[in-house]
């Protein structure tokens, strides 16, 4: 039986120190091939722009989407896109657990004094993915400057809080969906429906979704707290489910609860892992 909470002789601070060194080594290795690294970084920026192109085409045909103007939807796009991109850099490697379980190589993660999740993240860390942050970051800056927001202190604070909480939500979703691999092995497509699919959902107001899907992204997989509720709070827009705009203030608590749930599920999954040789 594996111990997923093993933290080595120096505790969690020691683990984070080891993680930073492993990530640093990975970055230095990638930087040895600078031309390739830069090209891959630029390609990530261009790929991120495809979703924005779809939104631009949509607003070439309509003036507003469920009462949201182009700049207001751009605000959704920026908040969700930045959060997703940062989570992609640090947490998307969790989905590789299924590949290692299937190949019988997950056992090696259990023999080292570092949590398997951090080993997965550090081992496949790719800084080039940070290129996906650039484009939604620019869109977010333009949207914040161009929309009519009453910049009270609480609204100013909401922007970094929403970005941090949204990153945690996406990271937790990656870990949760990847945990299923310990029972079914093949989970990447299942996980993509909630991670990459969830990123697409955060780009639009939930007003355009059907009632059951609105409830799903609000109460089950709380993607509405990534961009929709924070943006509605900034813009003082009403919610189709009748929730007050202050629902956005629950964003940090929701992200923390989801992160704790993800940790519990992952730990339980690793604890009951049986290697191919057992």
Where do the PLM segments sit?
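Hydrophobic transmembrane alpha-helices and immediately adjacent juxtamembrane helices
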Residues: 2-278
């Amino acid at each position: 039986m594996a111990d997923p909470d093993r933290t080595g002789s120096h505790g969690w601070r020691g683990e984070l120190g080891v993680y930073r060194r492993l990530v640093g080594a990975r970055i230095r290795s990638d930087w040895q091939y600078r031309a390739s690294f830069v090209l891959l970084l630029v390609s990530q920026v261009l790929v991120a722009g495809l979703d924005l192109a779809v939104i631009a085409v949509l607003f070439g045909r309509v003036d507003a989407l469920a009462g949201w103007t182009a700049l207001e939807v751009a605000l959704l796009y920026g908040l969700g896109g930045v959060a997703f991109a940062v989570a992609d850099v640090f947490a998307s490697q969790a989905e590789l657990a299924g590949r290692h379980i299937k190949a019988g190589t997950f056992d090696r993660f259990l023999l080292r004094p570092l949590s398997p999740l951090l080993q997965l993240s550090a081992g496949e860390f790719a800084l080039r993915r940070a290129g996906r942050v650039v484009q939604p970051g620019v869109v977010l800056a333009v949207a914040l400057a161009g929309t009519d927001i009453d910049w009270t202190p609480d609204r100013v604070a909401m922007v970094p809080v929403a970005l941090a909480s949204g990153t945690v939500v996406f990271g937790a979703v990656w870990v949760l969906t990847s945990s299923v691999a310990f029972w079914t092995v093949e989970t990447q497509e299942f996980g993509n429906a909630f991670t990459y699919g969830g990123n697409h959902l955060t780009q639009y107001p939930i007003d355009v979704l059907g009632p059951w899907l609105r409830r799903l992204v609000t109460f089950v997989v709380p993607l509405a707290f990534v961009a929709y509720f924070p943006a509605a709070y900034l813009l003082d827009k009403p919610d189709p489910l009748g929730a007050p705009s202050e629902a956005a203030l629950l964003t940090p608590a929701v992200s923390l609860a989801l992160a704790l749930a993800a940790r519990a599920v992952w730990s339980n999954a690793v604890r009951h892992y049986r290697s191919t040789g057992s």
